[in-house]
Amino acid sequence: MESGTSRTSDTGGTGRAGSTETSGSGDIARTLELLWDTGRRPSRGPKPTLTLDRVVEAAVQIADAEGLEGLSMRRVAAELGTGTMSLYRYVPGKGELLDLMLDRVQRPSENPADLGDGGWRAALEAMARETLALYRRHPWLLQVNQSRPILGPSAMDGMEKVLTLIRPMGLTDPELVSAIIMIDGYVVGAARSQLYQQEAERRTGLTDAEFWRAQVPMLEKVLASGRYPVMASLSEDTFGPDFDHFGFGLQRILDGLEVLVAQRRGESAP
């Protein structure tokens, strides 16, 4: 998430269920050195022909196009027109590279306006929508179990920005973090659902509208039988594409937090 919170995702970027990679699976100390740029730099030898930044960018582009199943050190080397062994001068292996990729794509926006008008509710809503957009841009993120994230600059910067805006809620520190995790989990579920729909269309060749239209004749007979009176009474737009299910659910979560915030303020009032 662009706020930098931890998360666990369990679907593939190509619609395949189950995480295929785990963050923090490489050398943790070395990964942190690379993320925070604190490692020793060689003072002798030929000047490197690549940069770590180029290696990470190439890896992200491959994952965006092919999913994590298409990512390997050899594949990245081929993309950069170099030998596989030359990459190990910049990054120890695929595990560390993955954590660098996560930090790269989850870099928070530097524009303060992107987190709303400065209020906690607007900040959490903006965070949720930005995170959903992030999964759409980089669906391979849903292939990574991020329950134990490596805390690089992007994670820390993002969390700092969001916590700064939501601290006035008056909740305890664990509750503030829990609110972020709760919203992040909601976003992951929504992103997963959208990816499954895209994968179903790709595999069947039927659009969502075509799929449901094929069921209409039988459903009309079933609903006319009187067996399902409540479902038969539903309006025609009940299952239509125009209703913003994501926005509706997000607002209800924020409404619940609003109640808690008001309750805490009432408890602290003289």
Curated annotation (Swiss-Prot):
Major site of localization recorded for this protein: cytoplasm
Residues of the HTH tetR-type domain: 49-109
SUPFAM superfamilies linked to this entry: Homeodomain-like, Tetracyclin repressor-like, C-terminal domain
Localization (cell): Cytoplasm
Protein's UniProt keywords contain Secreted: no
Signal peptide: none
Regulation: Daunorubicin and doxorubicin can induce dissociation of DrrR1 from its DNA complex. Ampicillin cannot release DrrR1 from the DNA complex at the same concentrations.
GO cellular component, one term: cytoplasm
DNA-binding region(s) from the entry: 72-91
Start-end of Low complexity biased regions: 1-11
Keyword check for Repressor: yes
Ranges annotated as spanning the membrane: none
Knocked-out gene: effects: The transcriptional level of drrA2-drrB2 is significantly up-regulated in the drrR1 deletion mutant compared with that in the wild-type strain.
An MF annotation (GO) of this entry: DNA-binding transcription factor activity
GO annotation, biological process: negative regulation of DNA-templated transcription
Region spans: Disordered: 1-28
UniProt cross-references to Pfam families, sorted A to Z: TetR_C_1, TetR_N
Top-rank taxon, per record: Bacteria
Keyword terms, alphabetized: Cytoplasm, DNA-binding, Repressor, Transcription, Transcription regulation
Its biological purpose: Transcriptional regulator that modulates the expression of the drrA2-drrB2 genes, which encode an ABC transporter involved in daunorubicin efflux, in response to intracellular daunorubicin/doxorubicin accumulation. In the absence of daunorubicin or doxorubicin, binds directly to the drrA2-drrB2 promoter region and negatively regulates expression of the genes. In the presence of daunorubicin or doxorubicin, DrrR1 dissociates from DNA, leading to the transcription of the genes.
Stated name of the protein: HTH-type transcriptional repressor DrrR1
Organism the protein comes from: Streptomyces coeruleorubidus
